[in-house]
Amino acid sequence: MINFIRSYALYFAWAISCAGTLISIFYSYILNVEPCILCYYQRICLFPLTVILGISAYREDSSIKLYILPQAVLGLGISIYQVFLQEIPGMQLDICGRVSCSTKIFLFSYVTIPMASVVAFGAIVCLLVLTKKYRG
């Protein structure tokens, strides 16, 4: 099983980043949910991953993980920080604009958007670490 995951880790990471990008765009432009500043930072980390992971999966080039792993770890850190903002009472961020970074918006009735982001970035990071070496 682990060999299967390692063999297709780039494809799985790409699929997760595509799903995250599509859900983010859906919430912003279809449901008109205005993102907070931390959500924008997470998008800055996520959106390029979709393109880069797609190209590297197509080319079976796992050496790209050296360049995109820090970006995924940064996105994970930002999303963990936002979960703390939402879950720890009294924590507030001064840079939040019109939309508070601690406002909870739920996916599937029980998972907040930042928690879904933690899961997505965490899975991408794990998959990049497990990626089978193809070239290089």
UniProtKB/Swiss-Prot annotation:
Pfam families xref list: DsbB
GO BP of this protein: protein folding
Predominant place of localization: membrane
GO molecular function: protein-disulfide reductase activity
Chain ranges passing through the membrane: 7-26, 41-60, 67-84, 109-131
Domain of life where this protein originates: Bacteria
Coiled-coil stretches noted in the UniProt entry, renumbered to this chain: none
Task performed by this protein: Required for disulfide bond formation in some proteins.
HAMAP family: BdbC
Protein name (database record): Probable disulfide formation protein
